[in-house]
Curated annotation (Swiss-Prot):
Pfam families: Ribosomal_S17. One of the primary rRNA binding proteins, it binds specifically to the 5'-end of 16S ribosomal RNA. NCBIfam families: PRK08572.1, uS17_arch. GO terms for cellular component: cytosolic small ribosomal subunit. Belongs to the universal ribosomal protein uS17 family. It comes from the Archaea. This is Small ribosomal subunit protein uS17. Part of the 30S ribosomal subunit. The keyword RNA-binding applies. GO terms for biological process: translation.
Length: 113
């Protein structure tokens, strides 16, 4: 059964039996939601997402572009790959470094080229 996770995104077409999936498991999402690009998918069921943001510098009264890397859980039904543009949402701590889960793939790497 597909749950409503509270975000206006298209649910995945595939079904999975992962308990840490927000669509098919019992994982609740809350808090911050980010867009980013997957830079690594080597760990099992984990992706590293890089997001860019602007930071205001008071001294120079200008903005600079910064980036941060976030580890996120990658459910089997979503299966994000390197180069994909994804939407990640905050959740409870899933491991030592994972506090986010991939909710949707906004653009596949093949479509972005």
């Amino acid at each position: 059964m597909m749950r409503d996770i509270g975000l206006r995104v298209q649910p995945p077409a595939e079904k999975c039996d992962d308990p840490k999936c927000p669509w098919h498991g019992n994982l609740k999402i809350h808090g911050r939601v980010f867009e980013g690009i997957v830079v690594s998918d080597k760990p099992r069921k984990t992706v590293t997402v890089e997001r860019q943001y602007y930071f205001y510098l008071n001294k120079y009264e200008r903005y600079e572009l910064r980036r941060s890397k976030i580890h996120a859980h990658n459910p089997p039904c979503i299966n994000a790959k390197v180069g994909d543009k994804v939407l990640i949402a905050e959740t409870r701590p899933l491991s030592k470094t994972k506090h986010f889960v991939v909710v949707a793939v906004l653009e596949r790497a093949e479509e972005r080229r």
